[in-house]
């Protein structure tokens, strides 16, 4: 960081061929990661810390005091806590040898116990270049005035694994705003591939868990083959509808704001939901449709504002 400039750069030193960084939501939870943290320990590390802060009544403590409480050697506890710090559960002040418990630790334990909602949002940035290049490999840049975090090298984002909503940013670029909102251009896939949106300047609102689709280029729908056929994973095999919907404006509600984990589907049925705001059109001037014989100025299908819910299970007949 050049203190005379407004940008803080994150990445790897010159000579690195592949630079990777991971950015996670403070409410991110993965069961596999929870189990991985447990390892061979008798007590889960997060539970051990929670027991300590309950006993002492403080979330800021010295490493040595925690080692005595846990009964493990100091050197082992230092490694133990360093690992948790790298994963964002605690802040480790190596100079003072003190620990401050972070929000993510509490969120993880609430998610595990079923007492709190969670999300699966994370960003993996990978930037690759020649190892001969003598410049820093930049994964992200934070503007300290606007608080915008520009991130490069992000090929895919999972917004909801239960609703199967994924984003594919154009050029791997996104701009993360405050409180996990972010802006990107590219493709959104929802409903296990049934519903695909292409466009620019899409704005994801974290708290309300929806996407403002500012500039939609087109909407591509896919439906199950009839009779129903399934792939090796048990998913229905889909076929794309030949025509796409254009001149669309609207939004995509991924799930209820209090059900970002998607675990309470019975309480909040019908998601994901796409809603169009204004009239839209289907044109038939693609080369794949009778070699563009139908000019869009003469032939089109006019759609009034519409809504499609349950994007993961609609059928051709239902449409």
Language-model features: where?
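Structural signature for solvent-exposed beta-strand/loop edge elements and short helix-capping sites
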Residues: 1-319
């Amino acid at each position: 960081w050049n203190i005379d400039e407004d940008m803080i750069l994150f990445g790897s030193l010159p000579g690195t061929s592949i630079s990777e960084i991971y950015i996670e939501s403070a409410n991110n939870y993965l069961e596999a990661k929870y189990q991985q943290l447990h390892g061979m320990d008798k007590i889960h590390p997060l539970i051990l810390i929670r027991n300590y802060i309950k006993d002492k009544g403080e979330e800021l403590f010295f490493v040595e005091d925690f080692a005595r409480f846990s009964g493990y050697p100091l050197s082992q506890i230092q490694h133990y806590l360093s690992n948790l710090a790298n994963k964002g559960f605690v802040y480790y002040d190596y100079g003072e040898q003190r620990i401050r418990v972070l929000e993510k630790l509490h969120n993880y334990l609430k998610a595990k116990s079923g007492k709190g909602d969670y999300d699966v949002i994370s960003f993996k940035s990978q930037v690759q270049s020649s190892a001969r290049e003598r410049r820093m490999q930049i994964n992200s840049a934070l503007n300290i005035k606007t608080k915008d975090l520009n991130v490069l090298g992000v090929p895919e984002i999972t917004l909801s694994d239960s609703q199967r909503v994924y984003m594919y940013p154009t050029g791997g670029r996104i701009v993360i705003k405050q409180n996990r909102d972010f802006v990107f251009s590219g493709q959104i896939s929802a409903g296990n591939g049934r519903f695909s949106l292409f466009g620019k300047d899409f704005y994801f609102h974290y708290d309300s868990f929806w996407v403002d689709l500012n500039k939609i280029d087109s909407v591509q729908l896919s439906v199950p083959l009839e009779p129903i056929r399934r792939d090796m994973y048990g998913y229905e095999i889909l076929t794309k509808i030949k025509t796409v919907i254009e001149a669309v404006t609207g939004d995509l509600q991924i799930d209820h704001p209090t059900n970002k984990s998607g675990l309470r589907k019975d309480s909040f049925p019908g998601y994901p939901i796409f809603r169009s705001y204004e009239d839209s059109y289907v044109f038939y001037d693609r080369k794949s449709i009778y070699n563009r014989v139908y000019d869009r100025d003469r032939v089109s299908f006019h759609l009034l504002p519409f809504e499609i819910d349950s994007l993961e299970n609609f059928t051709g007949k239902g449409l």
